[in-house]
Amino acid sequence: MKKLMVVLSLIAAAWAEEQNKLVHGGPCDKTSHPYQAALYTSGHLLCGGVLIHPLWVLTAAHCKKPNLQVFLGKHNLRQRESSQEQSSVVRAVIHPDYDAASHDQDIMLLRLARPAKLSELIQPLPLERDCSANTTSCHILGWGKTADGDFPDTIQCAYIHLVSREECEHAYPGQITQNMLCAGDEKYGKDSCQGDSGGPLVCGDHLRGLVSWGNIPCGSKEKPGVYTNVCRYTNWIQKTIQAK
């Protein structure tokens, strides 16, 4: 199988102007990702996102752009699919403590113009609320750049595992906060990359992380991807959604 590189991260202020991608993955099953969102700006894929409520999509704060369009129910970006829905964003809420330079608190909520019509191919993903959850087997997905430098038509998936905080801090000395976690694959270098930012890290059928930043080039066996640690934000997410 053709190996794909998943670069789900942008590094430093300049990174936030790029997009992320998947490395060493393969095509996802069409029914395996009903929560996945594709964020577009000016007709081009910008980032991934996650449907967590019929009216709300969660993504990375560095994906903030004007006039975002959100697509749900997508599998092949080059085709118009009967399952797809498109919505504009009426409200973007970046975490108040987001720091673009360090990528700390890299999380944002997007309120859709209208509720998503839930179906087999459009469903919200539950949040991981337990930061001590020990499910280490995870997967990442997105339409980001692959190992051969192309952007795939169909969404790609890769299985990875959580990396201990000690290993994470060793890979990125002085850069990892409690609001971040690392995941990767030391055997094949499976990773997120350009075009995958803001997309989900799914562990045990719950949203554990959001693609945030990492090593450039993507897919290093020694440098795992860095993700926003979603369990740290469940209260903020709930309060934001419930706010008038």
From Swiss-Prot:
Q: What does this protein do?
A: Serine protease which exhibits a preference for Arg over Lys in the substrate P1 position and for Ser or Pro in the P2 position. Shows activity against amyloid precursor protein, myelin basic protein, gelatin, casein and extracellular matrix proteins such as fibronectin, laminin, vitronectin and collagen. Degrades alpha-synuclein and prevents its polymerization, indicating that it may be involved in the pathogenesis of Parkinson disease and other synucleinopathies. May be involved in regulation of axon outgrowth following spinal cord injury.
Annotated EC? 3.4.21.-
Keywords linked to the UniProt accession: Autocatalytic cleavage, Cleavage on pair of basic residues, Cytoplasm, Disulfide bond, Endoplasmic reticulum, Glycoprotein, Hydrolase, Microsome, Mitochondrion, Nucleus, Protease, Secreted, Serine protease, Signal, Zymogen
Positions of the propeptide removed during maturation: 17-21
Positions annotated as active site in the UniProt record = 62, 106, 197
Q: What is its main location?
A: secreted
Domain of life, per UniProt, equals Eukaryota
Give the SMART domains listed for this entry.
Tryp_SPc
Modification after translation, per record: Inactivated by autolytic cleavage after Arg-80.
Q: Which PANTHER family match?
A: KALLIKREIN-6, KALLIKREIN-RELATED
Q: Which GO terms describe its cellular component?
A: cornified envelope; cytoplasm; endoplasmic reticulum; extracellular region; extracellular space; intercellular bridge; mitochondrion; nuclear membrane
Q: Which InterPro entries match?
A: Peptidase_S1_PA, Peptidase_S1_PA_chymotrypsin, Peptidase_S1A, Trypsin_dom, TRYPSIN_HIS, TRYPSIN_SER
Question: Which residues carry a glycan?
Answer: 134
Q: Name one Pfam family in it.
A: Trypsin
Disulfide bridge map: 28-157, 47-63, 131-231, 138-203, 168-182, 193-218
What's known about how it's activated or inhibited? Inhibited by a range of serine protease inhibitors including soybean trypsin inhibitor, benzamidine and serpins. Activated by a range of glycosaminoglycans including chondroitin sulfate, dermatan sulfate, heparan sulfate and heparin.
CDD domains assigned: Tryp_SPc
Provide the protein name.
Answer: Kallikrein-6
SUPFAM superfamilies the record matches:
Trypsin-like serine proteases
Query: Where's it found, cell-wise?
Result: Secreted; Nucleus, Nucleolus; Cytoplasm; Mitochondrion
Q: Which residues form the Peptidase S1 domain?
A: 22-242
GO MF entry, a single one: serine-type endopeptidase activity
Site residues, Cleavage:
80-81
**Ranges in coiled-coil conformation:** none
Induction conditions: By spinal cord injury. This effect is particularly prominent in macrophages, microglia and reactive astrocytes.
